[in-house]
Amino acid sequence: DGTTLRWDPRDITNPLIGSVHDPIYQGARRDLAEGGVPEPKPGLVTEAHGGILFIDEIGEMDPMLQNKLLKVLEDKRVRFESAYYDPTDAHIPDYIRQLFDQGAPADFVLIAATTRSPEEISPALRSRAAEIFFEPLTPEQIAEIIRGAAKKLRVEMEERVPEIISEYTIEGRKATNLLADAY
């Protein structure tokens, strides 16, 4: 019943962990900015609470961010910090005080994919995961993918094209891109 979200570390528009908007330099809602109140912005790990978070190409993720993700997985919460947060300030709304004091919930199932070598992923993060490895596609499988892609693209090609493309890659996506670029 939970949410399923997809995130790619190469996409910088959606923060994974979340952030705190500095009321002076980054701006905040008018009612918060005038009082100098920092505004926590929950990220995708909080949005995925109770559901699934899929991280595509986790191997491209900065190692520091991998460690932050590890902390979230361990605590099942995201903690927010800001030099502008003053727990004694009576003007801070209760919901913001609660986010700073208790954090935001982030209990989710993490599914991640990578084409990188397992050794390139944080060992601590890997130790908390069930790993599934897929064998590289065979040249015959690549050729079959090319024939299927050619049908979908309505491309007529010479009989040997699938075999030629299969000599250059073991990835289905790259193979279909080669076909699309050629035709």
Question: Which role does the model predict for each range below?
Answer:
Residues 8-17, 119-152, 159-163:
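Conserved AAA+ ATPase core "coupling" helix
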Residues 83-85, 136-139, 176:
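Short, acidic/turn-prone active-site loops that include or flank metal/cofactor-
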Residues 63, 119, 139, 155, ...:
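Alpha-helix boundary/capping and short turn/kink residues
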Residues 158, 168-183:
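The conserved phosphate-sensing helix
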Residues 1-119, 130:
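Conserved ASCE/P-loop NTPase catalytic core
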